């Protein structure tokens, strides 16, 4: 059995190892730390019954934008654990957090033109649409599809529930809650 849960600072090395095994796009540890300290609600891992991380999603909110939107930085599932719906569950968890915590209007991501499996997951299962093609986006010169999926965002959010409730923080409202959370996560890491 594999469970999907929010990532912690303690998961970052395993997430990086999973990334290195699965993808040609790799990141330094400080980039993972930047994500978890800035947007702790948006990182999820798939953990097997032995406590091993077998997949993850690394996501963030785009700050330099007039529209509040999330971005999927990286998604990976180990080859041994594919075809179990884990990528869909990881993506769904991150998208829901973007919507609930940050009131994101849409989610964006990039995918290699040649990556048919990922492209099919995004379009057929998760409802993403091609927004643009970015020529030579990847280091090896391959083009990327810039894809987007609309979320309810601010405009429909409260009406959909039929009642009003307050959400803490967000890229489009005050960031106080997010900073508090990041400091708490940071404090946890320092005090170990």
From Swiss-Prot:
One of the GO BP terms on file: response to water deprivation
Pfam families, alphabetized: Acetyltransf_1
Residue ranges constituting the N-acetyltransferase domain according to the UniProt record: 2-152
Catalytic reaction equation(s): N-terminal glycyl-[protein] + acetyl-CoA = N-terminal N(alpha)-acetylglycyl-[protein] + CoA + H(+); N-terminal L-alanyl-[protein] + acetyl-CoA = N-terminal N(alpha)-acetyl-L-alanyl-[protein] + CoA + H(+); N-terminal L-seryl-[protein] + acetyl-CoA = N-terminal N(alpha)-acetyl-L-seryl-[protein] + CoA + H(+); N-terminal L-valyl-[protein] + acetyl-CoA = N-terminal N(alpha)-acetyl-L-valyl-[protein] + CoA + H(+)
Assembly and oligomerization: Part of the NatA complex. Interacts with NAA15.
Task performed by this protein: Catalytic subunit of the NatA N-alpha-acetyltransferase complex. Required for male gametocyte development, embryogenesis, suspensor development and the formation of the quiescent center (QC) in the root meristem. Involved in plant immunity through the regulation of SNC1 and RPM1 stability.
Protein name according to UniProt: N-terminal acetyltransferase A complex catalytic subunit NAA10
Organism of this sequence: Arabidopsis thaliana (Mouse-ear cress)
Organism lineage string: Eukaryota, Viridiplantae, Streptophyta, Embryophyta, Tracheophyta
Encoding gene (name): NAA10
């Amino acid at each position: 059995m594999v469970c999907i849960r929010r990532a912690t600072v303690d998961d970052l090395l395993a997430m990086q190892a999973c990334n290195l095994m699965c993808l040609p796009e790799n990141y330094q540890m400080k980039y993972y730390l930047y994500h978890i300290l800035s947007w702790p609600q948006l990182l999820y891992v798939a953990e097997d019954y032995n406590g091993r991380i077998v997949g993850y999603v690394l996501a963030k909110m785009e700050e330099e934008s007039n529209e509040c939107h999330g971005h999927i930085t990286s998604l990976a599932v180990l080859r041994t654990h594919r075809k179990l719906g884990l990528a869909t569950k990881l993506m769904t968890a991150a998208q829901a957090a973007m919507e609930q915590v940050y009131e994101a209007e849409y989610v964006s991501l990039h995918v290699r033109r040649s990556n048919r499996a990922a492209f099919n997951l995004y379009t057929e299962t998760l409802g993403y649409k091609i927004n643009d093609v970015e020529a030579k986006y990847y280091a090896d010169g391959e083009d990327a599809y810039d894809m987007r999926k609309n979320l309810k965002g601010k405009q429909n959010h409260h009406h959909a529930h039929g009642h009003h409730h307050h959400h803490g923080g967000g890229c489009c409202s005050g960031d106080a809650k997010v900073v508090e959370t990041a400091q708490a996560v940071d404090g946890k890491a320092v005090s170990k």
